[in-house]
Amino acid sequence: MERNKKIVFFLALALLWTTAITVACLVDMSDVPAANVENIDKLAHLGFYAIFSILWFLYLENKIESTPKLFLIVFMLSVIFGVFIEFCQSTFTANRQADVNDAIANTIGATIGLLLMAIYTKKFKK
């Protein structure tokens, strides 16, 4: 894919995913049937933030030359966004509340996503 199209493509995906997380975490979910699986919400947070960090990595790798700096920026972006969403849940919603365990799951998910990108980068970007 042409470099500029690739940049726009990954930016669009990252923004769409960020919007999807925001909506999913801030809307009233009390009418949604709950899965009868223990800690399913934590697994969802892991998945959301693994994908979040991968998409932002794929966009920002075209903007940031230094690989360690890229990993640090994407990690910090993921953590800050996750904490911001938890803050918004406790401040701006009536049916949602902040949960430290969600923030931890977000951080673990972001770390998993970045570990996958480290493997990808090492294997395919020599």
Stretches found by the model and what they are:
Residues 1-96, 100, 107, 111-126:
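Bulky hydrophobic segments
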